[in-house]
Amino acid sequence: MRLIQLWILLMVSGMCFAQYSDHQLYQAYLERDMRVWQEHIASAEWDSLSIEEKKQLLNYEYGFTAYMLGQDAHEAQRLIARYEQHLNALKEQLPAARYHAYLSSIYTYRLGLDRKHLMKYASKIYDNINLAMDLDDNDALVCAMQGNVEFYSPFGSKKQALEYFQKADSLYRSEAKLHEKWNRCAVQLTLVQCLIKLDRKEEAKGLCAQYIAAEPQFELMKQLLPQCD
């Protein structure tokens, strides 16, 4: 009887974070089925997770919160608070560069919901991403976030953004972590968008076709292809 109880306990504790596998979450990202991400994040019991599982969940929260900014401002506000709470809980376990890169994204999300405080948030965004780059400019996530800052900021440089995206793509390719495959696809998407903005549409079209050939279910990339003409 005790063995059965132990088996049930182990099964339940494992389910605290394993509602969806990294592969399923990656496929959901490609197919733009973010309901899967929402269910996965909502079902995770933070206190029951290992440090590594918490780090992986934080990365999914980073991505899903960005998605929700364009869907539901009230829910996005709640997710930002949760994301920040989890980031603070992992401050000592994360590499310092990643901590400051994630913190930069939190201020970016807040700015997305509160344009009245542009200068306040912009300063914190740049301070944290610049510090992250100083600490480790060979971290793929850090490079990708620096690229995002350059790409989306009205004061940024699309040319520099492209260089950061290219470097991040290369770093993600060499690291090949399943739970970060979606991050690489996000980088590839903004890389193509950056080429379009720089009026390098032939190059953008070639890369776009290449990425779709590699991942035929990549919906956002397929939607981007007509913009390359």
In which residue ranges do the predicted regions lie?
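Terminal, low-structured helical/coil segments at or just beyond the last alpha-helical repeat
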Residues: 178-229
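Sec-dependent signal peptide recognition
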Residues: 2-9
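Amphipathic alpha-helical repeat scaffolds of TPR domains
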Residues: 20-24, 47-70, 94-113, 137-154, ...
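Eukaryote-skewed repeat-based solenoidal scaffolds used as protein-protein interaction platforms
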Residues: 106-153, 164, 168-174
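Primarily a tetratricopeptide repeat
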Residues: 39, 78-81, 85, 120-123, ...
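Amphipathic alpha-helical segments of tetratricopeptide repeats
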Residues: 42-46, 84-88, 92, 127-134, ...
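Short coil/turn connectors between adjacent alpha-helices in alpha-solenoid helical repeat scaffolds
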Residues: 25-35, 65-79, 108-122, 152-162, ...
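N-terminal signal peptide c-region/cleavage motif recognized by signal peptidases
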Residues: 13-16
